Structures are given as structure tokens and as C-alpha cells.
Amino acid sequence: DEYCTDVVEAVMTILDQQGIEHPHIVTESGRATVAYYSILLFNILDVSIAETGESIPDVLPEDVPEPVVNLREVLQGLSVRNLQECYNDAVYYRDEMRQLFITGRVTLRQRTLADKYFWAIINRIAEEKEKLKHTPKELADIDSTLADIYYGNFSVFQSLPDAWAIDQLFPVMPVHRLTEFPSRKAVISDITCDSDGRIDKFIDPQGMRTSLDLHPLVDGDEYYLGVFLVGAYQETLGDLHNLLGDTNVVSIRISEDGSYQFVREIRGDSVADILDYVEYDPRRILEDLREAAERAVREKRITPSERYKILQTFEDGLRGYTYFER
């Protein structure tokens, strides 16, 4: 309110001095005015396919541990009327089996069998809960548990810090293959080593959802996603978490007739740039490696040709992008 008062008072004072009639002031400051100018694009590097609970044996082995028997009974007794109870039981017996495995009292095959039953239960619960008018809170996020993990070539902390810091929801979608049906439910992980480096909340017409419909990856083809409305401060707020630097930037001007031109291209940070930011001298590091390689040649641990390849590869790495390059 004080900000608005100051703006209006300043405008009013100047207009009064000039004898100009006061206008109606219409303004929208902040995210709504600047979010539209920027889009984050990144490729998907790999995917972890969610467990489906398939290939469950018809007959249990004789030496099967009791938690596996209990998990099977949970699966057989599961119905739309006892979803919450079955979920709680499945988690309990799954955790019990994990503890037995940690203490060496069950085999890896036995634990794997328990996991298959657990995921079969979770899949059944996900199917049955769609019949409920009101989903229990504990089951609301079960779709994200069953979602694939798509690994994106980006850093949440560098490019989408508000998604992590204040749970800001950004529109996310594929930017190609739009005539194909997106048959996989997924969450998105970045390439940092931080468990918070993921997007698992997405915009939905009903408010929010915990997975995103994406296409299956095709071997040999790139798959690109776009995150929209990121023009509001994301580039300014981003930081060097895991030493992942600024991304490549392309500025595009779109004409009224739909044509466009590339106005400016800015290369993202190189590995050498980031090392310099954190006060490591890339030239000193390279020189240290050069001396070590020379010493290895003199001691006949590597050949001169191998020395050249080592130094060339290291120099290429210093000049390279901080993100994955194919």
C-alpha cells in the first residue's frame, strides 16, 4: 500500500504543478508484467521408468519371508473400500522387509519379490482411487510415486529458483511431438546432486497435479521441454549450486506477421568461468596438470601421444559448457 501511495502521490504532485487533470492509473507491477519475456528450454538426458509391479508369481516359494506373504494378502484383499488401510499395510510390510534385508536375514531375490508386490499394490490403489469422490490426503500424491523420472539438462537452483524456494508453479510442456499422445506420467529431475532439484508440482485446470504427461523417449532423438513465464527474476535469483552456471541465451524478435529474427546470442558460462568465479585459477590448474603429465612421460608411465590427448581433453573441458553436451 505504501508503494502505491508513493507512486500515486508523485504523479499527482507533478500533474498539479502542471495544471493537468488527474488520470485513472492502471498498473500491474511485478511478475505479471515481465514473466512472459523468457522461456527455459532444455533437453531430456535419460529417464527412470517407474515400477509397475508386473511378473508376480502365481505361487510363492516355500521359504518366502512372512512380510511377502502379508503383502500378497494385502493385494488380494484390496478394494475401493479399504484403500487407505491397504496403503498403510503395504508401506509397513515393505519397510519391515527392508529392515530384514539390512540385517542380512533375507536375500536380495526375496526383497525383490516383496518390492514387486508392493508396487502392484500401489498401482492398484492408484487405479481404484479414481472411483472415489474424495481422495484421502495420504493417497493424493500417489501418482507422483508411480511417475517416471525424466532427467533434464538444467539446474532448478540456477534457472528456476522460485520453484524450489517458494513453490512457484510454472507452465511446463513439450515443445515438439505435439500431435502425439503423451502416454507417460512423469516428474522432472535436474542434473544437480540435490534431492530438491526436481519439479514435481504442475499447473492443472483444477489447480495442481503431481505429475506431467510426457512422451516416451525415442532412441537417438532429442526430447525438449519448455518452462514458461520465467522472465520474472529467475535469471537474477539463480545461483551456482553444484557449479552449474548461466545457460546459453538467445534473444528473438517476433514480427506481427509471425516471422522472427535472432537479435542476440550469448554463450553460457564455461567450466573455466565457473572455476574463476569460485577463485580457482584455470590456468594454474592446467599448468599443474601439464607438469604432472610431463613428469609421467619422463617416468615412462604414459607416452607423449597420451600426454597430448590428456591435455587436449582437459583444455576442451575447461572451454566447455557446465551442462551436459552430446
Regions found by a protein language model. Name each.
Residues 1-14:
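Alpha-helix-loop-beta-strand connector modules within alpha/beta enzyme cores
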Residues 14-20:
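Short helix-capping segments at alpha-helix termini
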Residues 20, 24, 29-326:
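Charged (often Lys/Glu-rich) extended helix/loop segments that serve as interaction or gating elements
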